């Protein structure tokens, strides 16, 4: 394709590439999902209060996401599972912590209560 008059084509492309900004109006009307609302809140986002714990003396402890809050409630709630080391009787709130304790062979020290008395060893089931 041989085009002889490049100046005319360049002028046509330049004219068509200029948008008419006067007809656009407010950008908030065109992009409501991208621009935040004027009052600062956006729909569908979590508020600061959603991931806070007010139970069992936490006084509004804030968590980064909901799953961390759920794990916190499970571990610190009244019906929390306790994982006990079969060697020394240490208590853990997570089975992974108990397993790591066993892998590191941390059972060689005597477990004591906060008052200094030795904690009895757990009974081993036959």
From Swiss-Prot:
Transcription regulation keyword on record: yes
Keywords from the UniProt entry: Metal-binding, Nucleus, Repeat, Transcription, Transcription regulation, Zinc, Zinc-finger
A GO cellular component entry from the record: nucleus
Start-end of Basic and acidic residues biased regions: 115-126
GO MF annotation terms: zinc ion binding
Region (Disordered): 17-52, 103-126
Keyword Zinc: yes
Main location as per UniProt: nucleus
Top-level taxonomic group: Eukaryota
Biased composition (Polar residues): 38-48
Location relative to the cell: Nucleus
InterPro entries: Znf_C2H2_sf (IPR036236)
ZnF region ranges: C2H2-type: 51-76, 83-115
Transmembrane regions: none
Family that this chain belongs to: Belongs to the GLI C2H2-type zinc-finger protein family.
Function: Transcription factor that probably regulates the expression of the gene cluster that mediates the biosynthesis of squalestatin S1 (SQS1, also known as zaragozic acid A), a heavily oxidized fungal polyketide that offers potent cholesterol lowering activity by targeting squalene synthase (SS).
Protein's UniProt name: C2H2-type zinc-finger transcription factor M5
Species of origin: Phoma sp. (strain ATCC 20986 / MF5453)
